[in-house]
């Protein structure tokens, strides 16, 4: 079996903090080229953002076509002096491989590559269809020059995908406890309340926006947006900052702002959600409070891969290796699956995510072996 642990180590040793690649894609490209994949390195640009390198590799020309997706970029390591082992060492200690990206998600990518190479080795270097890899270096930051553009680039070339496995760390506690089959949408905005600046000693000459924005925050937060759906938990609106831009104690501010984020389910579209919140705001304002919402652009719409043959196949592979039947979940934050879902059904399954983004991020060596076996089981069933 191809050593997924070695690939994980080699990837961790590339300090690929977004937007730097630091050689990570080269590690993967060399392995895939040697196995017969046709590879493409594609760089995308956008004014005001860093250029990002991406990798697309495919073997086979027919269907069915399964693609493994992922990202080699990582978040900064934080205070490196606080790490038990160097953050980009990829050292193994007490059954764990340490390093930024071990869990999120260089370990998952390494396992998918190792599984694909083993499958090809056992089947005459050709799948009964096609296997590809969609790997970006722009997931942990703005996600502008990464998967979303790589998918469009592939589509413009005539590439089509039947199914996708995204190797994000989906498991909560142990390997095999969770597959992500969808994600809630994400919409952010700023609530702005207009008052009138003045001296605190003469409140009748001013209009204080602070009490008003407080009332509106309560009004928008208290009433549920929905009761959830068959596959999703209830949507939630959370205010995250309140600011008046005023450092003086004797001045009534003229304007107040409160930022918020909504994680919403399939009871809403982006448009209907905005309309609902605007309607509630207008009701709470009445004829007295002057307020409006500045909505931020969002590319994080809700999606769901409905349970069916593909999810059944993945569940069977997981259950065979781990003895556990995974939960089909839609919890958690956003991922690049939101982009992939526009092109094909996508599931997320990877390592246990308990230490991702933390000091001493680490993956169990045993879990890496387990995930490789599961991915191999998915390929065996997919091309059966």
UniProtKB/Swiss-Prot annotation:
Which UniProt key words apply to this protein? Amino-acid biosynthesis, Cobalt, Diaminopimelate biosynthesis, Hydrolase, Lysine biosynthesis, Metal-binding, Zinc
CDD domains (alphabetical): M20_DapE_proteobac
Pfam families referenced in this protein's UniProt entry, alphabetically: M20_dimer (PF07687), Peptidase_M20 (PF01546)
Sites binding Zn(2+) 1 sit at: 71, 104, 168
Q: Where is the active site?
A: 73, 139 (proton acceptor)
Domain of life according to the entry: Bacteria
Q: Which residues bind Zn(2+) 2?
A: 104, 140, 357
Q: In which pathway does it act?
A: Amino-acid biosynthesis; L-lysine biosynthesis via DAP pathway; LL-2,6-diaminopimelate from (S)-tetrahydrodipicolinate (succinylase route): step 3/3
Reaction(s) this enzyme catalyzes, per UniProt: N-succinyl-(2S,6S)-2,6-diaminopimelate + H2O = (2S,6S)-2,6-diaminopimelate + succinate
Query: What cofactor does this one take?
Result: Zn(2+); Co(2+)
Describe how the cofactor binds.
Answer: Binds 2 Zn(2+) or Co(2+) ions per subunit.
Give its E.C. classification number: 3.5.1.18
| One of the protein's GO biological processes | L-arginine biosynthetic process
Q: Which GO terms fall under molecular function for this chain's record?
A: acetylornithine deacetylase activity; cobalt ion binding; succinyl-diaminopimelate desuccinylase activity; zinc ion binding
Under InterPro entries, the record lists: Bact_exopeptidase_dim_dom, DapE_proteobac, Peptidase_M20, Peptidase_M20_dimer, Peptidase_M20A
Provide the family line: Belongs to the peptidase M20A family. DapE subfamily.
What is the protein's known function?
Answer: Catalyzes the hydrolysis of N-succinyl-L,L-diaminopimelic acid (SDAP), forming succinate and LL-2,6-diaminopimelate (DAP), an intermediate involved in the bacterial biosynthesis of lysine and meso-diaminopimelic acid, an essential component of bacterial cell walls.
| Complexes and interactors | Homodimer.
Q: What is this protein called?
A: Succinyl-diaminopimelate desuccinylase
Q: Which organism is it from?
A: Bradyrhizobium sp. (strain ORS 278)
**GN (gene name):** dapE
């Amino acid at each position: 079996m191809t050593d997924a642990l070695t690939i994980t180590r080699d990837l961790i040793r590339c300090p690929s903090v977004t937007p730097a690649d630091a050689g990570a894609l080269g590690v993967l490209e060399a392995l895939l080229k040697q196995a017969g994949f046709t590879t493409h390195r594609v760089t995308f640009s956008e004014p005001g953002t860093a250029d990002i390198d991406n990798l697309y590799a495919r073997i086979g020309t027919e269907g069915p076509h399964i693609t493994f997706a992922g990202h080699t970029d990582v978040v900064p390591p934080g205070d490196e002096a606080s790490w038990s082992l160097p953050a980009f060492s990829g050292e193994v200690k007490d059954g764990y491989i340490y390093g930024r990206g071990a869990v999120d998600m260089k370990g998952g990518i390494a396992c998918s590559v190792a599984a694909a190479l083993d499958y090809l080795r056992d089947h005459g270097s050709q799948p009964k269809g096609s296997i590809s890899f969609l790997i970006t270096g722009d997931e942990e930051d703005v996600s502008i020059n990464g998967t979303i553009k790589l998918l469009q680039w592939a589509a413009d070339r005539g590439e089509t995908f039947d199914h996708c496995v995204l190797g994000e760390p989906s498991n909560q506690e142990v390997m095999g406890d969770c597959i992500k089959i969808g994600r809630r949408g994400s919409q952010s905005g700023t609530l702005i309340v207009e008052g009138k600046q003045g001296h605190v000693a003469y409140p009748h000459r001013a209009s204080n926006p602070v009490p008003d924005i407080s009332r509106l925050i309560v009004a928008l937060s208290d009433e549920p947006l929905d009761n959830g759906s068959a596959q999703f938990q209830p949507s939630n609106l959370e205010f995250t900052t309140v600011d008046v831009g005023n450092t003086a104690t004797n001045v009534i501010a003229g304007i107040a702002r409160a930022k918020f984020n909504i994680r919403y389910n399939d009871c809403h579209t982006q448009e209907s959600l905005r309309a609902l919140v605007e309607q509630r705001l207008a009701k709470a304002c009445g004829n007295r409070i002057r307020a409006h919402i500045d909505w931020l652009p969002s590319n994080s719409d809700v999606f769901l891969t409905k349970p069916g043959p593909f999810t059944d196949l993945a569940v069977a592979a997981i259950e065979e290796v781990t003895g556990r039947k995974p939960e089909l979940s839609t919890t958690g934050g956003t991922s690049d699956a939101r982009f992939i879902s526009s092109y094909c059904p996508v599931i997320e399954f990877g390592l246990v995510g308990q230490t991702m983004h933390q000091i001493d991020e680490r993956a169990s060596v045993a879990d890496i072996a387990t995930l490789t076996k599961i991915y191999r089981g998915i390929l065996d069933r997919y091309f059966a």
